[in-house]
Amino acid sequence: MEVLREKVEEEEEAEREEAAKRAEWARTEKMMRPVEVRKEETTLTQEMLRDLEKKLSEIQIPISAELPAFTKDTIDISKLPVSYKTNTPKEEHLLQVADNFSRQYSHLCPDRVPLFLHPLNECEVPKFVSTTLRPTLMPYPELYNWDSCAQFVSDFLTMVPLPDPLKPPSHLYSSTTVLNYQKGNCFDFSTMLCSMLIGSGYDAYCVNGYGSLDLCHMDLTREVCPLTVKPKETVQKEEKVLPKKYTIRPPRDLCSRFEQEQEVKKQQEIRAQEKKQLREEEERLMEAEKAKPDALHGLRVHSWVLVLSGKREVPENFFIDAFTGHSYSTQDERFLGIESLWNHKNYWINMQDCWNCCKDLIFDLGDPVRWEYMLLGTDKSQLSLTEEDDSGINDEDDVENLGKEDEDKSFDMPHSWVEQIEISPEAFETRCPNGKKVIQYKRAKLEKWAPYLNSNGLVSRLTTYEDLECTNILEIKEWYQNREDMLELKHINKTTDLKIDYFKPGHPQALRVHSYKSMQPEMDRVIEFYETARVDGLIKREETARTMTEYYQGRPDFLSYRHANFRPRVKKLALSSAESNPRPIVKITEQFFRNPAKPAEEDVAERVFLLAEERIQLRYHCRDDHITASKREFLRRTEVDSKGNKIIMTPDMCISFEVEPMEHTKKLLYQYEAMMHLKREEKLSRHQVWESELEVLEILKLREEEEAAHTLTISIYDTKRNEKSKEYREAMERVMHEEHLRQVETQLDYLAPFLAQLPPGEKLTRWQAVRLKDECLSDFKQRLINKANLIQARFEKETQELQKKQQWYQENQVTLTPEDEDLYLSYCSQAMFRIRILEQRLNRHKELAPLKYLALEEKLYKDPRLGELQKIFA
């Protein structure tokens, strides 16, 4: 505070000198001005002050009509620990230091608002704000970075407005209470987020300042949804191709240059008019979207988080609004000023002017002129001293004395009074309160759900609208999780009715993207695949009513493209009967990549099967040193004529253009073998096109079944949802329980009731040992007999009741209704089950009773307490 006091005294002295100069200048100017001007000057009277006070009192401060359900009266404090209800001596000392600091600040800066130092907690106990922060590193890897932490806090908590928008809250609850009730104001949000960020290693601070109306009310209706912002496309500069030496000159341009210039002028005028209309429309929309003037602009209290650069490789300072989880630059106009900030170690007051919002603030907390700290010993280093200042403290004794003085004045911040912040896996997975949250953006609405809350796996939906009133839907995006069909995103365009499904790797058909307007077959659609998951290397398949195009990659035959043209069916059969009545193929076009193992003049680049015209066209790859490629065309004829005579290959059946003709390619045998090979390839291509049609039908049928079932996958580690794992765990628990009962049974002391009849500590005689052994065996034998009789009695009782029921059924069989017969059959089934179980238990008891008797007898002989028996049988 010494630096602050010196600074304030210097400013007051400068203000007094300036006021004296200003008064003297005003008197001189007043004497020089005319009388008429001097008459117009007025001073503020008591009546004018009362009128001003009345006008100011008429300003309505908008306070939320709904009282927040999260108040100190709704919190159960009976189960809170002692640290919440009392203060330690060190905390009491800290509160005294804070009060002294606040008094000095109020005395030296009377125009500033009171400091937000020690609000009450949920137990009505004052706690210093720095001790309310509890640095915590969450056990979830997703919460290790600042963006995921901020988004979690924004989703997990529900925003509650401040009771008074012009003042900080009177209560600041612990993060454990805020997590328990999932509600809080901006200070609760910031405290929670700052605790998580500090625990994750960030240099984070809670800020007490002023924000805009939208920021304080979490109003995002004038902000664009981040999910709708498209990434900027990088424009690649086209490299200028240098003209080759021997190139064909372009034809001479015979168009009129005057007409071209006039057309260019006309197009420029049209574009200028369109730009003007577009600019006017944008201005109109901006005027409609512009926020209304806020009477309390610059006065609304808000809290957010400041993250300084340095730790965790943060390149520059930035703000985080805990309400939305969005990050902002420190130059953002939404943040209008800062009063103070704090972390878990110290508290700082902003001594800089915020007339230009936070744009000119320098966040060097080690500068005591700009940031006044409350406690010494902060981790923020002070400003470096100049050489003149440094020359005066070269003596070692002075340095030691200075260190002792600082050590005496320093005060360590007490540990946080808040319990360890814990988020259960169930709460972390649920995220939003009650599993759902809705956020309204500008022309968009974002809905979020917890995983497994919706039966179809829907976790998020973004609805984009055309107008600001959000009435006309443009498109819908839906995100899914844990789908068995690996569906990740569904994009629906309401304008074109186009639907696009995106899949993660693992679909049975290796689907990646499916674009369609209708699930009916032979309609316009585009299907993309994960080519690494397919044997045939298919990347994409485009289908229309008359065409089908396929793109391949990584095939051993170097096929890259196949395009099939169809004609309408002769008979109008059902579309789903493509297997029995496929679409007639008119043309098949196939393209191939370059095969380096073959010479270019023998490597086919494109082949076209014209089925209706019975022709096959080939185009070969072009050599690097050539500008034209070889071509061939075969006239495909039947092997026999109408009379059954075999047709011989003739030269007119092959038309070829060869860049470098070779002798063997002119022979009819070569051409005949090539045509026979192409016939086989044509048959194979037709079969592959037919298989592609069947695969499309299979994919559509599978997608309809998946959409109807929308089965969700459950991890084997999710023991609460995984039924198989749950049944296995319950079975293991039953086995362990039965094993425990068997162990208890083996550890029963059969002699204890009989030894209790004798005086304690008395040594057994031989006669007493024999008598105890006989009594124990006879008692055990009687219990075995009683158990057998009990089972036999239950067996006979069940048998008699069943016989009576059967006799009753024989007597009343004619008058019985179907319901009575069903009840009778059900009873008989249950009775027979009980009789069968009792019979099995009785038979097992008869088998095990002698063995149990002999085992007990042997155990008694070996019991050290009946040592006399061992002497008898020794």
From Swiss-Prot:
The lineage of its organism: Eukaryota, Metazoa, Chordata, Craniata, Vertebrata. One of its GO terms (cellular component) is cytoskeleton. Pfam families: CEPT76_peptidase, DRC7_C, MORN_DRC7. Component of the nexin-dynein regulatory complex (N-DRC) a key regulator of ciliary/flagellar motility which maintains the alignment and integrity of the distal axoneme and regulates microtubule sliding in motile axonemes. Involved in the regulation of flagellar motility. Essential for male fertility, sperm head morphogenesis and sperm flagellum formation. Residues 386-400 have a biased composition (Acidic residues). One of its GO terms (biological process) is flagellated sperm motility. This is Dynein regulatory complex subunit 7. SUPFAM superfamilies: Cysteine proteinases. Residues 1-22, 386-410 are annotated as: Disordered.
